[in-house]
């Protein structure tokens, strides 16, 4: 094989070849790139392409309507045109202005949300224009767009394609058009496709209705139709753009932010560029940064009166050219301040000397300049650090276990004290890594010479004890520019940000579905016996907050056989492909669902049973596995929240199933008693020659049920609610009467179609009875309904 190296070695020189290669290199437009890499955007097959195009158009429609505060009405139609399929998606959103229509649909990476940290379905500005690109590549036909805004009586109609060389729209035709809608947008695309992905297409439409209960969705395709009405009139909460969170940014992002900010100080930068950072939090981050950037200073105990160290004399001897009276006062005051402190660092000693010097200058009218102060600090510090072995012994002894003998503790502490004494920096200032080196060297020497072992845990405990004793230095932190120019300093700032306790990011940038609406969406599409939902508090990943939501529907008409049905969503968008590559499924399989009442062979893998499990990840930037946004990436923070949410919902399901088993057991017992009780009552009546017992009343007493019975005397109707149980109950009792009632002051009365509905909501204590009364004239018919109490715990004799 001939190589460039061999040709260059023949003496021909490399310059012509390099120039030739350089001339062949050129940039390409993003449109041209995706023209050759359609699979990256989800257009990797005819079947999937149709689903992807529907998804992109519907996502745009939902976002547009919600941003305008409009309850979405979405119409989707797929027509078989022979060689191609025609896709039409129509919405009732605010419409798009004439100037923006070509750019929105005919230019890739054109959008308003890429830099915004708030939750939206689309963000990059690729989706709908990618569908237009795929349409023109496969059918050669332009996209047809009709859009109308509230401020115009006529709509704007465009036919356009994308110039892949320039990534600019090419308008084939434009005109004003008549459209009956007051506002909205309609797009028609013709493309190659097939309906082999009909299931995924139907799933996408159905799941969109589940996760957007505020939307009305209508769908038509050649063989089927689907319509879902709104389950709520409540729009998702409006989102607000936020700044990144300090716990989520990475080093490259931080360097970019440092370089771009207008702030001079680190405190100003932190407060201006990050969310949840006020003055107090910024101070905490900067102190943590100081520890990493400058190191801490060791705080030593001052000499005690019984020790052979005299700070006052040492300071006095260090002062020159001052009056004896001022010198004595200065030395005495410094010694008194130092002796009163439990421990002090070099920086704290410097502050003491400076404060005392200022006072002495004012009292004695003599100047204690910088040199005098430095000499005094040096002399006093030598006195303080004359013997630090006692401090080191106390720290080592407190950090190690009682199994260490005194000789071992003494050996380690003595050698550690020597490391501080021999330190080049007389201030005993050190970073944590340096302190670890001190401890390791002292421990290694102790093991070698004293035959005493200090393992990893003991060493780390000693490091922690000494580090906690050391104090943060007051040095002025570097400026933003200095940190931006020093990658190591920026890395230390990043560590400080991540180690500081900071409130979770605000959630007003997110629009989670909410627990109530998760259940409403499931109820709209699944006729189940039990529903539960969980919305977790916001967490953060990569500077972006996220919220995880889980819903479970169980029983009812849900299929018993096979695996549970899983619904995956990201920012309210159904994910119908790449299930095996999605973090939501990985975590779901890892939960032991047998603990929560579902079948799961081996305790892992997809559970089976009559259940639907819905998972939703809402974030300002969902981490997808690819540009096609089919699966959520395996991010530890998101996986942790998914696991906790699934387990919490699982516990709700477990409680429900346990309760159902208890009620079933109660039902069987009640059925047995109900079978034998009439015979027992008849026999007892025969033996005692008394009236037969009220079987319903007796059954309620035996089962500790709630008994509701009616008595009618002349015009008075009385409903008695007897609670034979031990706990309070709050039934909703509704009596439907064919005649107009009177005297029902405690009830809510509604007339409908010639019938009167009387509703009470009494609270009845255990062993107590509530009486509900009203008057009615003439012969009336009654029909009673009692809700709020399980059927197994209720007996109605009315």
From Swiss-Prot:
Residues 221-233 have a biased composition (Basic and acidic residues). Homodimer. Heterotetramer of two Top6A and two Top6B chains. This is Type 2 DNA topoisomerase 6 subunit B. Belongs to the TOP6B family. ATP binds at residues 60, 91, 112-113, 122-129, 629. SMART domains: HATPase_c (SM00387). The keyword ATP-binding applies. It catalyses: ATP-dependent breakage, passage and rejoining of double-stranded DNA. It comes from the Archaea. Residues 221-245 are annotated as: Disordered. GO terms for molecular function: ATP binding; DNA binding; DNA topoisomerase type II (double strand cut, ATP-hydrolyzing) activity. It comes from Natronomonas pharaonis (strain ATCC 35678 / DSM 2160 / CIP 103997 / JCM 8858 / NBRC 14720 / NCIMB 2260 / Gabara) (Halobacterium pharaonis). Its EC number is 5.6.2.2. Keywords: ATP-binding, DNA-binding, Isomerase, Nucleotide-binding, Topoisomerase. Relaxes both positive and negative superturns and exhibits a strong decatenase activity. GO terms for biological process: DNA topological change. The gene is top6B. It holds the Pfam family HATPase_c.
């Amino acid at each position: 094989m001939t190589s460039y190296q061999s040709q260059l070695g023949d003496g021909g020189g490399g310059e012509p070849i390099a120039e030739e290669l350089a001339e062949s290199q050129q940039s390409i437009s993003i449109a041209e790139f995706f023209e050759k890499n359609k699979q990256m955007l989800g257009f990797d097959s005819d079947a999937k392409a149709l689903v992807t195009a529907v998804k992109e158009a519907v996502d745009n429609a939902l976002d547009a309507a919600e941003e305008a505060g409009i309850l979405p009405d979405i119409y989707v139609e797929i027509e078989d045109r022979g060689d191609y399929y025609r896709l039409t998606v129509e919405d009732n959103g605010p419409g798009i202005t004439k100037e923006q229509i070509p750019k929105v649909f005919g230019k890739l990476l054109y959008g308003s949300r890429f830099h915004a940290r708030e939750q939206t379905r689309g963000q990059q500005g690729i989706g709908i224009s990618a569908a237009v690109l795929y349409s023109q590549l496969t059918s050669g036909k332009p996209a047809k767009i009709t859009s109308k805004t509230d401020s115009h009586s006529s709509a704007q109609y465009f036919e356009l394609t994308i110039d892949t060389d320039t990534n600019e729209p090419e308008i084939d035709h434009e005109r004003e058009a008549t459209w009956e809608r007051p506002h909205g947008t309609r797009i028609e695309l013709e493309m190659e496709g097939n309906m082999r992905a009909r299931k995924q297409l139907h799933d996408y439409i159905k799941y969109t209705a589940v996760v957007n209960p505020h939307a009305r969705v209508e769908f038509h395709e050649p063989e089927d139709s689907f319509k879902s009405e709104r389950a709520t009139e409540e729009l998702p909460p409006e989102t607000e753009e936020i700044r990144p969170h300090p716990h989520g940014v990475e080093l490259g992002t931080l360097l970019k932010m440092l370089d771009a900010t207008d702030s001079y100080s680190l405190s100003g930068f932190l407060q201006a560029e990050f969310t949840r950072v006020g003055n107090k939090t910024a101070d905490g981050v900067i102190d943590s940064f100081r520890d990493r950037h400058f190191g801490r200073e060791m705080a030593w105990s001052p000499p005690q009166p019984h020790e052979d160290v005299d700070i006052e004399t040492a300071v006095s001897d260090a002062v020159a050219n001052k009056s004896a009276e001022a010198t004595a006062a200065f030395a005495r005051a410094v010694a008194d301040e130092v002796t009163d402190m439990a421990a002090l660092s070099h920086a704290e000693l410097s502050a003491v000397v400076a404060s005392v010097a200022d006072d002495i200058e004012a009292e004695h009218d003599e100047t204690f300049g910088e040199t005098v102060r430095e000499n005094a600090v040096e002399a006093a510090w030598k006195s303080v650090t004359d013997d630090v072995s006692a401090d080191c012994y106390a720290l080592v002894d407190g950090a190690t276990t009682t199994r260490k003998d005194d000789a071992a503790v003494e050996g380690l502490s003595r050698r550690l004290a020597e490391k501080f004494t021999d330190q080049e920096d007389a201030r005993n200032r050190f970073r944590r890594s340096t302190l670890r080196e001190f401890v390791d060297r002292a421990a290694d020497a102790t093991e070698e010479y004293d035959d005493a072992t200090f393992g990893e845990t003991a060493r780390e405990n000693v490091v922690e004890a000494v580090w906690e004793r050391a104090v943060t230095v007051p040095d002025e932190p570097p400026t933003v520019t200095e940190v931006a120019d020093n990658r190591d300093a920026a890395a230390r700032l990043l560590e400080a940000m991540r180690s500081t306790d900071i409130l979770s990011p605000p959630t007003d940038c997110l629009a989670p579905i909410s627990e109530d609406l998760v259940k409403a969406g499931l109820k709209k599409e699944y006729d189940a016996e039990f529903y539960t939902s969980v919305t977790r508090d916001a967490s953060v990943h990569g500077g972006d907050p996220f919220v995880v939501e889980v819903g479970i529907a169980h029983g009812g008409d849900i299929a018993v056989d096979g695996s549970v049905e899983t619904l995956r969503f990201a920012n309210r968008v159904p994910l119908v492909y790449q299930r095996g590559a999605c973090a939501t499924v990985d975590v779901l399989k890892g939960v032991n669902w047998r603990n929560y009442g579902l079948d799961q062979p081996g305790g892992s893998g997809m559970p089976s049973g009559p259940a639907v499990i819905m998972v939703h990840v809402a974030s300002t930037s969902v981490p997808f596995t690819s540009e096609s946004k089919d699966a959520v990436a395996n991010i530890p923070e998101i996986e942790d929240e998914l696991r906790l949410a699934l387990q919490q919902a699982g516990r709700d399901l477990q409680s429900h199933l346990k309760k159902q088993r208890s009620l079933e057991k109660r039902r069987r017992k009640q059925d047995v008693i109900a079978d034998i009780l009439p015979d027992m009552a008849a026999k007892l009546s025969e033996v005692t020659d008394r009236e037969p017992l009220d079987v319903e009343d007796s059954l309620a007493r035996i089962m500790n049920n709630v008994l509701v019975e009616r008595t009618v005397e002349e015009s008075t109707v009385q409903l008695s609610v007897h609670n034979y149980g031990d706990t309070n109950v709050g039934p909703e009792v509704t009596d439907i009467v064919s005649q107009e009632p009177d005297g029902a002051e405690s009830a809510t009365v509604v007339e409908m179609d010639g019938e009167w509905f009387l509703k009470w909501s009494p609270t009845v204590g255990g062993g107590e009875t509530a009486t509900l009364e009203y008057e009615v004239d003439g012969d009336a018919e009654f029909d009673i309904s009692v809700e709020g109490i399980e059927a197994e715990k209720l007996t109605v004799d009315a």
